[in-house]
Regions:
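Cyclophilin-like peptidyl-prolyl cis-trans isomerases
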Residues: 1-164
Length: 164
């Protein structure tokens, strides 16, 4: 499909950036897939990919860096780490095709209000992100809130490398 180039923000999100770079440097993302697409129907949404819990690929989880600490926000092009609960992020990430401010930390909200750890943004390849968002999903694949969001044909990540 093409190349997506990310610029990571190690100044504002040092823990999350270092974690992602460990996966890059150890080539743990090579051969994985973009396996999920949440399509809002208006060109917006997100794509998700990475290790998908493969025990041969995952590294220990990292501390959570909420957007209230980093000052980053979930706008179109943001790359962020997936997690179950705070402190469980490892080798899966998502990229936003549109602004989704609900993914930012919001301490005024009840429940799980710490958001997701944004740590960079797309500088090249947003057209590819949007093409993946628009790809067909399986109506039966996925569990819970992700049912129906799993790509019918996941997109292979050939390699992930530092550019300099």
């Amino acid at each position: 499909m093409g190349t997506i180039v990310l610029e990571l923000d190690g100044t504002h999100a040092p823990i999350t950036t270092a974690n992602f770079l460990r996966y890059v440097d150890q080539k743990r993302l090579d051969g994985t897939t973009i396996y999920r697409a949440l399509n809002f129907g208006d060109g917006g949404g997100l794509i998700q990919g990475g290790t998908r819990g493969n025990p041969k690929r995952i590294l220990p989880p990292i501390a959570h860096e909420p957007t209230t600490t980093t000052g980053l926000s979930h706008v179109a092009g943001t790359v962020s780490m997936t997690r179950f609960t705070p402190g469980t992020a490892n080798g899966d990430f998502f990229i936003l095709a549109s602004d989704i401010p609900q993914l930012d930390a919001d301490p005024s909200q009840p429940g799980d209000n710490v958001g997701y750890a944004a740590f960079g943004h797309v500088v090249e390849g947003m057209d590819i992100v949007k093409r993946i968002v628009a790809m067909p999903t399986s109506p039966t694949e996925g569990e819970g809130a992700m049912r129906g969001q799993m790509l019918a044909a996941p997109v292979k990540i050939i390699s992930v490398r530092r550019s300099n």
